[in-house]
Amino acid sequence: MGKHRINNIFDQITTDENLMSAYRKARRNKRMSYATLKFTEDLGGNLLKLQAEIRDGSYTPGQFRTFKIYEPKERVIRAPPFRDRVAQHALINVVGSYLMHGFYYHSYACVKGKGGHLASDVLARKYHELYSLWGGEVWVLKADIHHYFDSIDHGVLKAQLRRIIKDKGVLRLCDLYIDNNGKDVPVGIPVGNLTSQIFANVYLTDLDRYLKEQLRVPYMYRYMDDFVCLFRTRAEAEQCLEQAEIFLRERLKLELNPKTRIYKILHGVDFVGYRHYPDHKRVRKDSIERMNRRIRRYRMRGDMTAQQLLASFTSWSGHAGHADSAHLIQTMTQKVISAISERTI
């Protein structure tokens, strides 16, 4: 890839058509937010100003809005201003396909046409296939990266991008978003940035290649920093884990989560929101509990409308519908109906 680095694409970022496309993407699901409405008041003027700043190199990202989310787990989110969201979409519109071109085939995050549901379906089919061949003697290495986004090294990431991209204007923009992390150290990229999602996927592509091309891992599936490898023997899984830990520490400056483990296929594996078994898959228990908490909150606190509860349940049942969960969905449907009925009596 280094022999054919991408060049002469910077001007594509600031075309009128690309900036308007970026604006439309940035406002998706946020049309009535104050920041979106404020930017839209003088849409033409704001896009022209952004266009000029990016072109002459004076553009700098603004201050993050920092807040916490608590589901599926507690995380600090640093969200960029709306105009920066537009600029990031404009950048990714142009460079995204070049970055994704080098992704490992079974890497499922941030890739159009893939995603968590496909990752789950592919793993489920392979689980069933290997269980049919080898019975219970299939070994699983289930791993993820400890504090992944907060541990990404800026120097390593910039070097990776420079193996793909030659265009100095594009690299300058990428570096701006990498360096603007809300911290005083060159480590970590903010989860709230659109660019961070695709950069984080780029970052682990070196690990994908190492596991597949050097260690010859036969079956590997990754969704962002969460990955699963399947082996015929425990010894193979242990060797892979040992070498992966060394590679991550020395080359990518990352550590595996202490919960990383090796076990037999019959125990099932948690991946992309489901627990997979050789002949079926279930919704994870924490997902069920989160939906139950929303129902209890609706019943007890009164700070959630029926429409909000139904929207949350619709999203959850869509996720649950990709598992063997018909009875579970029926039970949860009755709970939601009961909760709404109690409030309307």
For each feature predicted by the language model, list its residue ranges.
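Conserved two-metal-ion catalytic palm core of "right-hand" nucleic acid polymerases
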Residues: M1-L157, G182
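Intrinsically disordered, low-complexity and often Lys/Arg-enriched segments
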Residues: M1-Q12, I246, I337-I345
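A general alpha-helix detector
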Residues: R5, V156-Q160, D226, R294, ...
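Conserved polymerase palm-domain catalytic core
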Residues: N46, E53-I54, H106, D121, ...
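Short, conserved aromatic-histidine micro-motifs
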Residues: G57-P61, V217-Y223, M291-T305
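Right-hand nucleic-acid polymerase module
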Residues: P80, H89, N180, V185, ...
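PAPS/PAP-binding and catalytic site of the sulfotransferase fold
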Residues: A90-V94, L241-A244, L248
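Active-site catalytic microenvironments for nucleophilic, acid-base chemistry
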Residues: V94-Y98, D206, Y210, F247
